[in-house]
Amino acid sequence: MMNGLGRQDIDFNTIWKNIADQVYKILTGSQNVSAMFLYEDVYKLCIAQPQPYCEPLYENIKKFFEQHVDQILLIILDTKSDTISEYLKQWKLFFSGCELCNKVIFRYLNLNWINKKILDKKFGHPPDVYEIQILGLMIWKERLFFKIKDRVLKCVEILIQKDRDGELVQHQFISQFMESLIKLDSVDKDRTLYLIEYEASYLENTRQFYTRESVAFIASSGISSYMKKAETRIDEEEQRSQKYLNSSSHDKMRRLLHSILIEKHKELLQSECINYLKDEKLDEIYNMYKLLSRIEGGLAPVLETVQKYIQHVGIDAIKSIPDRNNPDPKIYVETLLKIYLQFSSIIKKSFNNDVSFITVLDLACHKIFNQNHITRNTTKSPELLAKYCDMLLKKGNKQHEEIELEEKLGQIIVLFKYVDDKDVFQKFYSKMLSRRLINGTSVSDDIEKFMITGLKQACGFEYTSKFQRMFNDITLSAETNEEFKNHLIKNSLSIGKIDFSILVLTSGSWSLHSQTSSFIVPQELTLCISAFQQYYSTQHQGRKLNWLHHLCKAEAKSFFAKKSYDFQVTNFQLGILLIFNTQESVSLEEITKFTNLNENELSRTLQSLIEAKILISKKKDQNSINNNNNNNNNNNNNGEGNNSLVDSANNMQPSSSSSSTQEYTVNSAYSNKRSKVKVSSSLQKETPLQNEETYKGIDEDRKLYLQASIVRIMKARKTMNHVSLIQEVIEHSRLRFQPNIPMIKKCIEQLIEKEYITRAEGESDRYLYAA
């Protein structure tokens, strides 16, 4: 209510004429008008006495809008070349004018008469009156839009088509027209104007245009160029949708484009995948992936193609590796690694690191790794992988920078996850780690621990617990050695001039082959060994030391040649060499007596010393001949004639048949550029027999593991049928190895014999846990 405006008799026609004139100026934008003065006029008419003029005012407004809209229609129809521009110009003026009328000029009429009329009507029946703005829009819709819609829509379609053809157009005309339809729809609860008159036409024109263009473009430019074109078109239409379509239409437009540009050509796109892979066309693969990933199921055939191709390439690469029965671990693993890295890179670059393609890579690599012409079974790959790790982690091979080595080992861990029989890798890795730690040949402790951490992350703490205990033993051994030396000094004890150190290894933590001979320790070592034995027994009561002489090594200084040498040898080699401190020539029989080595170990140890040209082998009845030959070689070749000693060694290997006549002497003509010489030992190299024993040990460990698993499962379940038990045991074991069903059955039978489980009475395929 406005203060100071009392009810009074007024002239309706005069006031209305003023209102109409001013509203016309507002709707045509011809002159600025004071809306508040008009509000006062409307207020006067609404509170007039004796009868308010609300209804006549509403009817006059309605007629005024109708006449004005009819005039606008004529103006637009008279426009020859720029219909859409004129339409939007008139629309903006009319809409903004209606908005001002609704919110300010006729606000009192809306609140105090129109709204009451609407509320008074019976629920469900449309009202006879409308708020002023809605009234104006309804009149525009009925008296103008429907009469001119075809002409205006055609103009909009032409603009959209020109935009698609790359011509410069007034983009705002299209978006403003679309927004005008949304506003016109606001007066109708069905809101079909935008959907029927605009969206449907927009989508249909889009469908027709891209159907024609896609077919023609593929025919003229090929599928590779089409993929780029399609992606560009989709991006362009996404941008157009943001400007030219309501948000409710965006998904419809997207689905339509995907259907026309991708779905209809998906078989052709999918069929090109294999060619792109073979030719390593990474950009084309990426373009194909981007398109097909937009449609449901579009990538399924591509996933299958990629998996088969990786497997094909991998299997072919493995076939090219020489010596399938005894392949080089380095060649084998680096071949696998090359395949993995090659396709991992492709998946990262061309498939956006899509998890589905990563899974496909995993499946393909798993098959390549475990089922190729070299493995034939699943145990060969983990063995070769462990041996390759040993090559990387051991001194003496091609040295890598620490960062490079960590990267390499990280890649090995990735390959490791594809190993089915991780217990095989564990067994071989444990053996080789044992050797590296005992012989001090690890590249570094940090790198060793880096690898163990990677294995622990892959398989858990239990898998690497033995590895960690080995390191603990090495650390404790260093402390024990220091304490032993302090003990000797403190108690004024002497072990001679020998620099003695020892490794105390926990039984069960180390994968070591047992000693097969009762080696007789050289007299020179007995004092230090007995001193340490006594010291250790006082420090650790109840513990027993078992000496592993076949793993011991020593450094011996020699004086038999023209200059002295420091030989790095095994204890077995040392035991033989020390005999020559008291004898110039020693028979095979005497060496056997002094060392107590069995025939195999003695033969291999002697052979290593002969091949190193430290010892010379000869027969007693040929002493003079051999001596003459040696003298001639020394005189003629100035020490370079040592090659003849190799021939002698090759022809005179120790054997039981020649034990009565075979003799050995040190090679006084020995010569080497280095003063420190490491004498290789075949005893420290794994033999086929030892390899076979390793697999036997793995087999036994598996049986024990399966039995323990069966007992744990049955203890928890109490009763299970045969099939369910087999399935659960396989699932329980699969992270360590892939058990075969016959082995599981055998373990079940053994547990029945041991009375851990029993068969249910009357049900041969059901088992009961025996508490």
Curated annotation (Swiss-Prot):
Listed Pfam families: Cullin (PF00888), Cullin_Nedd8 (PF10557)
Keyword Ubl conjugation among UniProt keywords: yes
Pathway assignment: Protein modification; protein ubiquitination
GO CC annotations on file: cullin-RING ubiquitin ligase complex
Cross-link named Glycyl lysine isopeptide (Lys-Gly) (interchain with G-Cter in NEDD8), sites: 715
PTM statement from Swiss-Prot or TrEMBL: Neddylated; which enhances the ubiquitination activity of E3 ubiquitin-protein ligase complexes.
Compositional bias (Polar residues): 644-654
Extent of Low complexity compositional bias: 626-643
Molecular function terms from GO: ubiquitin protein ligase binding
Domain of life: Eukaryota
InterPro entries on file: Cullin, Cullin_CS, Cullin_homology, Cullin_homology_sf, Cullin_N, Cullin_neddylation_domain, Cullin_repeat-like_dom_sf, WH-like_DNA-bd_sf
All residue ranges annotated as the Cullin neddylation domain in the record: 701-762
Key words, A-Z: Developmental protein, Isopeptide bond, Ubl conjugation, Ubl conjugation pathway
Coiled-coil ranges (or none): none
GO biological process, one term: ubiquitin-dependent protein catabolic process
SUPFAM superfamilies named in the record: Cullin homology domain (SSF75632), Cullin repeat-like (SSF74788), Winged helix' DNA-binding domain (SSF46785)
Disordered: annotated span: 622-667
Protein's job: Probable core component of cullin-based SCF-like E3 ubiquitin-protein ligase complexes which mediate the ubiquitination and subsequent proteasomal degradation of target proteins. The E3 ubiquitin-protein ligase activity of the complex is dependent on the neddylation of the cullin subunit. Appears to ensure that the proper number of prestalk cells differentiate at the appropriate time in development. May govern prestalk cell differentiation.
Family: Belongs to the cullin family.
Protein name: Cullin-2
Lineage: Eukaryota, Amoebozoa, Evosea, Eumycetozoa, Dictyostelia
